[in-house]
Structures are given as structure tokens and as C-alpha cells.
Amino acid sequence: MSQTEGARLFRETWIAGVREHFPGEPKPGYVTPWEDTPEWEREAASAVYEQVRQFLALSSGHASRLTREQKSRFVATCWTAQMFKHFENPKPGYVADWPDLPDWQKETDSDIFEAIEKSLS
């Protein structure tokens, strides 16, 4: 899978997770299709996809044994680093520590890890 395809997988899984886990109606930006996603966000999705892919590869696939919480924490931490890369002063919600994230976001981050994992097998 190419970096672009991986980034799209990240975004499409994010949108599916938001639709499944978000309570009520999500903000439009949460479900913006890939074609309309800002370039910085595409780059961030690509980077996090690649970090998860490499993490799985470097563990010889054994990172799949992580709990859903551990998978979610990994994705969230990678995403936070991208927010600091792309924004001088990111919004606090963009860089919140994992325990402070809403449950829907934690679940969606786990879904992202598992979608990348599945794409590699």
C-alpha cells in the first residue's frame, strides 16, 4: 500500500469511527471526505499511517497483541506529534493527552490502528 493509500485508509477509518462512536451529530470537519481534507491533515494522516505500519513491522507483527487501549494511545500520541509539527500553537483539543480524549475518539483511534494492521495481513 502506498503512503497516499495508507493516508486515505487512515482518513476513511477515522470517518467510519466518528460515524460509529460519536454521540450525536459530528462536526462537519470530522467527516470531511478525503478529496476535501486540507493538505496538512493529509500529511499528518500519512505520517501516522507510516508510524503504525513501521511499528507493526518492527515488532514482527506482535504489536497486534496490544490491547485496544494501547493501540489507541499509540495512534493518539503519533497524531499529537503531527499537530505540533503542523501548528505553532495547536488548539488544546488537538494535543490533549490520551486520558483527556473523549471515548469516541479513543475508540476511533483503536479502529485506525486495527484497520492498518488488517491492511498489512
PLM regions with names:
Residues 1-121:
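Alpha-helical propensity feature that highlights long, continuous alpha-helices across diverse contexts
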